[in-house]
Amino acid sequence: MPITKAHDRYMRILLEHIGESKYPSGELMDRVEILLDRDHVDDYLEILFEKVEADRYPSKQLLDRIARWTLAAS
């Protein structure tokens, strides 16, 4: 369960922006990762996986973030 409804709403907004952006900013992803809770980890990783799968040459930054969070979530 999210910490608060406001936290959940804020996270959904940020995740939506990351998902819609072809090249999401590192600052925006850093902000999400600082506030990331168990309820949003899978959603965040799914967005990152979709971006990596859709790009022939995915960014090292996205790959590093996926690696970090898949290890942290295990």
Predicted regions and their residues:
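N-terminal acidic leader/helix
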Residues: 2-35, 57, 64, 71
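Amphipathic alpha-helical scaffolding segments comprising HEAT/armadillo-like alpha-solenoid repeats
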Residues: 11, 42-49
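Alpha-solenoid HEAT/Armadillo-like helical repeat scaffolds in large eukaryotic proteins
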Residues: 17, 50-51
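Short linear motifs in low-complexity or flexible loops
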Residues: 38-39
